Amino acid sequence: MTPGETLATEKRCVGELDARADALRALSASGIPFVVAGAYAYFEYTGIFRDTKDLDVFLRRKDVDAAFEVLGSAGFRCEMEDEVWIGKAFRGEWFVDLIFSSGNGIAVVDDAWFHHAREAEVMGVPVLVAPPEEIIWSKGFVCERERYDGHDVSNLIRAVGHQMSWERLLDRYGEHWEVLLSHLVMYRFAFPGERSQVPRWVMEELLRRGAETVAEGDWERRVCRGRLVSRTQYEHAVYELGYDDARAEVTNPAREVLENVAKLPAGGER
C-alpha cells in the first residue's frame, strides 16, 4: 500500500476501499484497456495526497459497455451519467467514475493515453496511471467557479515537467493553446525558482503566438469560447447576449452519436 493509500484508510471506510480495489481487479482481469487518473495519479506524480470520494478510471468510449458488463458481474450497478464524457459504477453508496472524455468533449481518451501511461500500483493492484501530459490536457479546461484545476496543473509541472513531452502537450491543446499558455503563466508565478521545468522554446512559441493575436485584433465573429473552460460562468454571454457557443461546436465522437440518434424517426426506424 502506498503512503497515499495509507492516509486514505484513515478517512475512508474499508467497504469503500474494497469497492475500489474490486473494480480495479475486475477491470484488470478483463483485459479492457484503462488508466487510473484523479487523486491516485496526482499523488503518484506529485506526492500530494488528496482525500477522494471516488476512483477515476479513464478508458475509450468504445470500451465503456464492456466495462459496464465486467463491473456488473462484480456487483456494481452501472449507468451512463453523460453520453459525452462519463459513466458511473455504484456499489451501495460508493462509486467509480468511468471517464472517456473531458466534460467539454475536447480531451477524448484515445490510444495515446495507454501508449504513454506509466506503471503503478493502486489499492494493491498493478495498473497504468494516465500520462501527465494527458492529465494536464484534461484538467486545463476545468476552470469552474466551484472547481479550478489550474493549481493541479502547476503542481504537476513542478513535479514532472522535465520528464514530459512538451511537443505532445502542445499538439493536444492545438487550437486551444491559449488555455495552456494561461496555465504556464500561472505556473511561472507560483514557482518562479523553477521556471525551467517548462522548456524555454515552449514559452517563446506560445508568446509568439500571443503577440500575433494582439496584432490580429478582434475576430469578426461574435463567439464565446468561455464555456469550454466553464459551463456556467459564460451562460449570460451565450443565452442573454447572443454570442455563438464554442462548446456546442466541439467535435466529439459521443456527441455525434447522440445527434444521429436524435435524428432518427420515432420508433428508431432508419
Task: Please provide the spans of the model-predicted regions.
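Anion (oxyanion) recognition and catalysis
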Residues: S28, G72, E121
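Short, hinge-like loop/turn segments at secondary-structure boundaries
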Residues: T52-D54, F76, D97-L98, H115, ...
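Catalytic metal-binding acidic patch
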Residues: G38, F43-L71, V153
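Short helix-loop-helix/strand-helix junction enriched in hydrophobic and basic residues
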Residues: S28, P33-Y40, E44-T46, V129-P131
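Catalytic cores of NTP-dependent nucleotidyl/adenyl transfer enzymes across multiple folds
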Residues: P3, V108-E269
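Conserved catalytic core of two-metal-ion nucleotidyltransferases
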Residues: G72-A112
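Helical scaffold of the NTase/Pol beta-like nucleotidyltransferase catalytic core
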Residues: M1-V36
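Short aromatic/hydrophobic-glycine micro-motifs
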Residues: I32, F76-R77, H162, A211
